[in-house]
Amino acid sequence: MDSADLPPTQKGRHYEIRAAGLRDFAGLRKPEQPLDPFKLAKYAKLLVVAYDQIEPLLTEETKKHLIGEGKDMWSGGAASQPLPDGRKLIILNPTHGKNRHRATLMEEVCHVFLGHKPSRLAIKRKDKQGKIVARDYNADIEEEAYGTGAAALIPYLALKRYIAEGKTSAEIARHFGVSRALVEFRIKVSKLWDLYKKNILATREK
């Protein structure tokens, strides 16, 4: 890839290059083409199951937590053990919208394609700040999967082009089928926020 097609930060370039590989694998040749992580999931041997299908297996206490008071504490979950055919079971939070589901699933797809060792999320201890941390949780791995997934869903080159055209984060989000929050995250980490604000302001003044 040409350096002009990549974000200015080292970490951003790292994620973008890996994201480009994923998009190429998905058969996408243009940066503005939306990526559907649900189509990629089967190649990553991920089986996405609706929450309704596993709900009968859960206790009332668990259900109340997952879709009640704890609904904002999780986006999706992967079974620790694979199915007999080798696929891994993925459950997405039913209280989240489809745009957020796409980002969550894309992160899980990236874990597989990047060769990450699965993180186990059993509670083990509290850190120095008193916050509960998970056993075997690797922040670097989680950041790489999320960053790569976000870059695959919203490529830098397309993002930069749309910002130059004066498109809003909401318009870009609709195009790629993701949340506005994810678009604005990408704008900021790609160091395009100042350009975005300038162009949006200029568009409104016309």
Predicted regions mapped to residue ranges:
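Active-site hotspot residues in diverse enzymes, especially metal/ion-binding acidic/histidine motifs
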Residues: 1-206
